[in-house]
From Swiss-Prot:
Ca(2+) 2 binds at V406, N409, L411, E413, E416, D419. GO terms for molecular function: metalloendopeptidase activity; metallopeptidase activity; toxin activity; zinc ion binding. It comes from Protobothrops flavoviridis (Habu). A motif (D/ECD-tripeptide) lies at residues 468-470. This is Zinc metalloproteinase/disintegrin-like HR1a. SUPFAM superfamilies: Blood coagulation inhibitor (disintegrin), Metalloproteases ('zincins'), catalytic domain. Disulfide bonds join C311-C391, C351-C375, C353-C358, C407-C426, C407-C436, C418-C431, C418-C436, C420-C426, C430-C453, C444-C450, C449-C475, C462-C482, C469-C494, C469-C501, C494-C506, C501-C506, C513-C528, C513-C563, C528-C571, C541-C551, C551-C558, C558-C597, C563-C571, C591-C602, C597-C602.
């Protein structure tokens, strides 16, 4: 029999509640001081690592005992993880530090099925946990007794800035709200989303700019600690999409910025993408890069990213302002921008999650959520299925400390078909929690035509028609996948002859103006479209070898889209240098009687199709 030595550090709850204190997380009103009690099972004679694979702490919150279970986040770093900084004379210095025995954990509260935790145990316990639906923060108090910790609700941290902060991505989907409304009503079940054998893996590089370096007192270790905490939370957030994020490299621009970081978020993103394509990708293989900067961008923007761009050499990037003293906030902003890279757009009012605000809200909430909305789940899976980004299919080599698989730890390990936790907590009906094998009767795990691990009945609608040009699809009864999307022929009149069908949609200029500018927008007068004959920055039809070609007179309604917002703004247009196609009239749009836009030319509908 294996003897187990139980090492227990017994400390009582410090009987004190404070009204206000300044902590690393900011000025906190109403906090509780506790001394966590750590219990660790160590096999007798075993060599104990500095940070165990699993740990357990007991303390009290609001006078009630809680047990915090922690498990080391072994997927935090890739095996070839590297760190790069620059000497004062500009020399690149790259190291490959040993990160196997790190101190970053995920966890849960015992007897609270909806609880989560993201904790650094490097110097005491620092991080956040969800308990009975409320978010709490914990961090060490710098008293003479170093084991004292403050525990407080997130809502008790004073606001850092009253002005609302926003993502700079503009909603450009010109179609009606109907698909979003329908998506918001979809119930995406756990078994449909599980994809246990098809996890996606994002190999992430984070670049901290020179302002970040100086913000943290030019101390590389402080920058690294901050980034590790952010990625630990980022990793936790994305597991709900069945995506694992591994940090493959951290680069700190300790001797000045290597791409242009300016007050314009759009210019900064463009320059960072060019640098990544030109330089970083040649030095380090990775899937996505995020620039973490301490600059205060113009306006209220604190983040920006390209949409549906994962794996693209230039555009699989995002920029994030290190806006808050709470790393949870910064991690949520980074999760938001990476969400754009994964094809997820901003939430509409019909989108919901298990919180007041979801991750893809355009406005960053003062109490940010760690959950993606139902709309985000649908958009993500649509992007994965339609665009099929290949770079995130390969699993990075992880920095595992070799240990036998443990059934019930919610990690899919060698020899397991599934792992949904203990029999008491497992919520995944396809999995036998006792054996970590799929039940023998399981027909499917995920897909539009999979429900409760079985194929949905033949004839069940799995893809509603999105317009009169589309055709609804139904399940076959013998496949988990919805049949291939079909639609009416291109060129068929639609919307009472205001448009012509194109790939299942009925594109008309009014819908595009509505999406760009809101309900008060209409299509501008014909005279506004004449600006497309100028061939300037915004008024043109197409680009050839980087040169903007003006529209021919008959093609002006196939170039830049012009909308009217009333007498004050009769010729409004949208233009952004990060994606110059946004704000152009869409292909297939009616541009005249029996004419549609094709290749930026207004041609006969019969010729186009």
């Amino acid at each position: 029999m294996i003897q187990v030595l139980l090492v227990t550090i017994c400390l009582a709850v410090f009987p004190y509640q404070g009204s206000s204190i300044i902590l690393g997380s900011g000025n906190v009103n109403d906090y509780e001081v506790v001394y966590p009690r750590k219990v660790t099972a160590v096999p007798k004679g075993a060599v104990q690592p500095k940070y165990e694979d699993t740990m357990q702490y007991e303390f009290k919150v609001n006078g009630e005992p809680v047990v915090l279970h922690l498990e080391k986040n072994k997927g935090l770093f890739s095996k070839d993880y590297s760190e790069t900084h620059y000497s004062p004379d500009g020399r690149e210095i790259t190291t490959y530090p040993s990160v196997e025995d790190h101190c970053y954990y995920h966890g849960r509260i015992q007897n609270d099925a909806d609880s989560t935790a993201s904790i650094s145990a490097c110097n005491g316990l620092k991080g956040h946990f969800k308990l009975q639906g409320e978010m709490y923060l914990i961090e060490p108090l710098r008293f003479s007794d170093s084991e004292a910790h403050a525990v407080f609700k997130y809502e008790n941290v004073e606001k850092e800035d009253e002005a609302p902060k926003m993502c700079g991505v503009t909603q450009t989907n010109w179609e009606s709200d109907e698909p979003i409304k329908k998506a918001s009503k979809l119930v995406v079940t756990a078994e449909q989303q599980r994809y246990l054998n098809n996890f996606r893996f994002i190999e992430l590089v984070i670049v901290a700019d020179y302002r970040m370096f100086t913000k943290f007192n030019s101390n590389l270790n402080e920058v690294k600690t901050w980034v590790y905490e952010i990625v630990n939370t980022l990793n936790e957030i994305y597991r709900y999409l069945y995506v694992r994020v591994a940090l493959v490299a951290l680069e700190v621009w300790s001797n000045g910025d290597l791409s242009s970081v300016t007050l314009s978020a759009y210019d900064t993103l463009d320059s960072f993408g060019e640098w990544r394509k030109r330089d970083l990708l040649k030095r380090k293989s990775h899937d996505n890069a995020q620039l973490l900067t301490a600059i205060d961008f113009n306006g209220t923007i604190i983040g920006l990213a390209h949409v549906a761009s994962m794996c693209d050499p230039k555009c699989s990037t995002g920029i994030v302002q290190d806006y808050s003293s709470r790393n949870l906030v910064v991690a949520v902003i980074m999760a938001h921008e990476m969400g754009h890279n994964l094809g997820i757009r901003h939430d509409r009012e019909n989108c919901t999650c298990h919180a007041n605000s979801c991750i893809m809200s355009a406005v960053i909430s003062d109490q940010p959520s760690k959950y993606f909305s139902n709309c985000s789940h649908v958009q993500y899976w649509n992007y994965i299925n339609d665009d099929e980004p290949q770079c995130i299919l390969n699993e990075p080599l992880r920095t595992d400390i070799v240990s036998p698989p443990v059934c019930g730890n919610e990690l899919l390990e060698v020899g397991e078909e599934c792992d949904c936790g203990s029999p008491a907590t497992c919520r995944y009906p396809c999995c036998d929690a006792a054996t970590c094998k799929l039940h023998s009767w399981v027909e499917c795990e995920s897909g539009e035509c999979c429900e409760q691990c079985r194929f949905r009945t033949a004839g069940t609608e799995c893809r509603a028609r999105r317009s009169e040009c589309d055709i609804a699809e139904s399940c076959t009864g013998h496949s988990a996948d919805c049949p291939t999307d079909r639609f009416h022929r291109n060129g068929q009149p639609c919307l009472h002859n205001f448009g012509y069908c194109y790939n299942g949609n009925c594109p008309i200029m009014y819908h595009q103006c509505y999406a760009l500018w809101g309900a008060n927008a209409t299509v501008a007068k014909d005279s506004c479209f004449e600006d497309n004959q100028k061939g300037n920055d915004y008024g043109y039809c197409r680009k050839e070898n980087g040169r903007k070609i003006p529209c021919e007179p008959q093609d002006v309604k196939c170039g830049r889209l012009y909308c009217s917002l009333g007498n004050q703004l009769p010729c409004r247009f949208f233009y952004t240098p990060t994606d110059e196609n946004i704000g152009m009239v869409d292909t297939g749009t009616k541009c005249g009687d029996k004419k549609v836009c094709s290749n930026r030319q207004c041609v006969d509908v019969n010729t186009a199709y």
